[in-house]
Amino acid sequence: MTKKTDALYAAPLHDIIDFQFDERVVAVFPDMIQRSVPGYGMIIANIGVIAARYAQPGSHCYDLGCSLGAATLAMRQRITAPDCDIIAVDNSPAMIERARELLSLDTGLYIPVTLLCSDLQEVTIENASVVVLNFTLQFIPPPQRLALMQRIYAGLNPGGILILSEKIAFSKPEQQQLHIELHHDFKRANGYSDLEISQKRSALENVMIPETVAVHQKRLQTAGFSCAELWFQCFNFASLVAIK
């Protein structure tokens, strides 16, 4: 499949609507996320590495908010624990349809994957050894986030993990501004114009709410996790691994 270039915000828009994962976004998503999220490829590759270490025989691995299935593919190609499977969930029908197409091209003798088009907050999590939330929690209203962490914790087997990747905020204003500016420089270096950066930011401001690493770690501790280790950060994007 040819990767299409993201030009969704290249022309001036009179009315900027809230960002949503519709067919237009799905068509350019691989290009969009590679050019927008510093270290995305490294995060995806190492989700596979981490999942391979913690996947338990006979358990489920969940990719909640799987989009086109990049993390699912990384886990599928790395996990060797017997009788494991992956349950990949997204609430965008367009994302699930395209993920199904991409997974069908991955013809190796890997562990089975079930794709579900569903609200991840309604999915039963049970007998889990690995749960992935890769840039997903930030789109869930903050008052609902602790309940989701508690559900994930309850569904994990002892020794299981949650991999949580997020755009993050900073408590000090000067630190926050520095990382915003560095991220914008990253996007410019990847070919986005100032107009595209500004319009995309306006589309996201009401639907994506970042939090500090400390807030994430405190919430994970409240949910019951024994530790929540920051294993990756590049500018204002980070990933943690939390262990039950």
Curated annotation (Swiss-Prot):
Keyword presence, Disulfide bond: no
Reaction(s) the record says it catalyses: prephenate + S-adenosyl-L-methionine = carboxy-S-adenosyl-L-methionine + 3-phenylpyruvate + H2O
Biological processes, Gene Ontology terms: tRNA wobble uridine modification
Record-listed E.C. numbers: 2.1.3.-
Stored SUPFAM superfamilies: S-adenosyl-L-methionine-dependent methyltransferases
Enzyme class, broadest EC rank: transferase
Record-stated family: Belongs to the class I-like SAM-binding methyltransferase superfamily. Cx-SAM synthase family.
Family annotation (NCBIfam families): carboxy-S-adenosyl-L-methionine synthase CmoA (TIGR00740), PRK15451.1 (NF011995)
Subunit structure: Homodimer.
Name of the molecule in the record: Carboxy-S-adenosyl-L-methionine synthase
Organism: Trichlorobacter lovleyi (strain ATCC BAA-1151 / DSM 17278 / SZ) (Geobacter lovleyi)
Gene field: cmoA
